[in-house]
């Protein structure tokens, strides 16, 4: 009787699970990267990338009927979260023709618009091709080349880490049968509520279709975790930003208690949605980054980020660039009361004061809390536009109605309106970002140069 009960329980669990489809074979585009040692020798690693489950075709398990079309759910297949998870399956992806994602050796190119698809988000897979590659960052550095020359105002070619589960949530949430192979388990410091599935269950209950994004909406739950933005950038502006959370791993939140971009009360949640950012333009150094500037976005650049600390305790995040064989130190702050060119606890406190921003960063653990979360982080690469604020927080003046002469308001040279999603999707569908030559290792091991600028 006990064995029969266990069997029945297992069958019920499978029926209610988030399913993986079989109509399209899932083949991850290969992407190599390098792991380096203290002496500067680097070994090639055979990885691949997988697209996030939110972009995938979601259809009935017993056929090919869409469970989700545009930004609405099929009510018969998805009357509630549990039934939807049982009735619907994520399927394999055609990376190039559907999503504009291509790889070649160590290079990954993401195209902004391909057919009806807008933007993409991919994760680096481990060599087993079943789990995400993870990185222990404190005491190490992470380096990559990037070409942002074809990323205009309003777009963001991002490279960042979050504390996603390496298996996509399969072991924590048995209802998730798709796992990392199908790009499940996303979370970040905005506690995003636009995810179709969280913790193996659908997010249909309370779903409200977006009024300005034909492909998205907001559900009743969000998925939270610490986020380390190494690179949020286009050809005009760039920023790197740590975002700590109260919990070190992925957690689910409900409604506006999630906070972040998707909720009425931005600071209601357990994560810091603002972070402590370093944007050279915002820090008053307006001639540093951009076309024909010190870091020239007309050309490929090498981006080096160092995580200073030991024993898991993070004390500083440093940035430098290599371009045309020369190492370029990060821009110095030109803001009164804020000194330095790296992210430290003192820098963050001084910056919040100078800009008149709420110090939500310290409330959720600050730099120390960020360091606590920086083991086994998952690498994410994406291209996207911003239906909330048109990327003005990155490359324009923000808030939109603020005086651009006030400290911290000007973040770049883009005019208001040019980054509107409708504008960039119609005028710049062929925009691209290319990431290549990813390297990871002890500090000083991943880059070299002929001279220092």
Curated annotation (Swiss-Prot):
Residues 1-17 form the signal peptide. Residues 402-428 are annotated as: Disordered. The keyword Magnesium does not apply. This is Probable 1,4-beta-D-glucan cellobiohydrolase A. Keywords: Carbohydrate metabolism, Cellulose degradation, Glycoprotein, Glycosidase, Hydrolase, Polysaccharide degradation, Secreted, Signal. One of its GO terms (biological process) is cellulose catabolic process. Belongs to the glycosyl hydrolase 7 (cellulase C) family. Glycans are attached at residues 62, 285, 388, 450.
